[in-house]
């Protein structure tokens, strides 16, 4: 039976990685519980008490009442009273009973699994009173009591049916209740219980809903990529007629975007053929040619800039590494020769009024 109780405690502790159907912050709650209470290590060995020669009923009904203060969703302080049960032992030579009760104070640590379901653990202490009777047929009759303090460990799950009503399933463990020098034994107690609690101050008037603020303007970014072979002849930075046609179409798209506070960046790229310095200069010249043309179409000169990137950021990767002939290599590297245009701006979000 002791192994069963420990297994339940371990299972509940395993859940305790997450926990919370907690009341509102800074509110009070109260409740009661009822369950199965079992004493462990119940042998008598002190103060003249004798062990039973018959059945010992270690499992009994346990009950309690509790109240607490919820500090925040994860922490509460809880106090309560527990009746841990009366354990009778019956034999034809020795009989009697052991019972205990106590007042406890614990910190309750919770964590939410779902909106209405928490896992929690309670840690603290109990001030207990233990009473024992021991009757030996034809011999001594003893009756003593003892008081003391023991640690309390508990874990469980709690579900909120409504904001004000919650239930909990809990396993609680208390070490060393009693003193063998007084009541003849010093058992431990484990109690598996079901509890119900009422949370005070959970209901409130529905808040007045303020009008939703106007949506924040959206920052938009658009990217366009044009092949340099369409815009320019190889190794040249002067726009071809078909390149101008391509930029005319691009200008129409840019005009349709119409962002506020817009800015356009034109990035020129080359392939890897040639020196770094030459490719950097050529990419800058090509980007500037595109900028000049778009400015001539109507884009404000202060809103558009040219940046030469040289042979950086090739899109072909290593696909052309084994191409040896120059003409074939030029064709293979064509995707690297490109002009990218990036448009950034703020666009107001228009919302429809509610019906």
Curated annotation (Swiss-Prot):
This is Outer membrane protein A. Belongs to the outer membrane OOP (TC 1.B.6) superfamily. OmpA family. Monomer and homodimer. One of its GO terms (molecular function) is porin activity. Pfam families: OmpA, OmpA_membrane. Sequence repeats lie at residues 210-211, 212-213, 214-215, 216-217. It comes from Shimwellia blattae (strain ATCC 29907 / DSM 4481 / JCM 1650 / NBRC 105725 / CDC 9005-74) (Escherichia blattae). It comes from the Bacteria. Its main location: membrane. Residues 219-347 form the OmpA-like domain. GO terms for cellular component: cell outer membrane; pore complex. The chain crosses the membrane at residues 27-37, 60-71, 75-83, 101-112, 117-125, 151-160, 165-172, 191-199. The record marks 78, 168 as: Part of salt bridge gating mechanism. Residues 1-21 form the signal peptide. It is found in: Cell outer membrane. The gene is ompA. GO terms for biological process: monoatomic ion transmembrane transport. It is a multi-pass membrane protein. Disulfide bonds join 320-332. Residues 210-217 are annotated as: 4 X 2 AA tandem repeats of A-P. The extracellular loops are most variable in sequence, and in some bacteria confer sensitivity to phage and/or colicins.
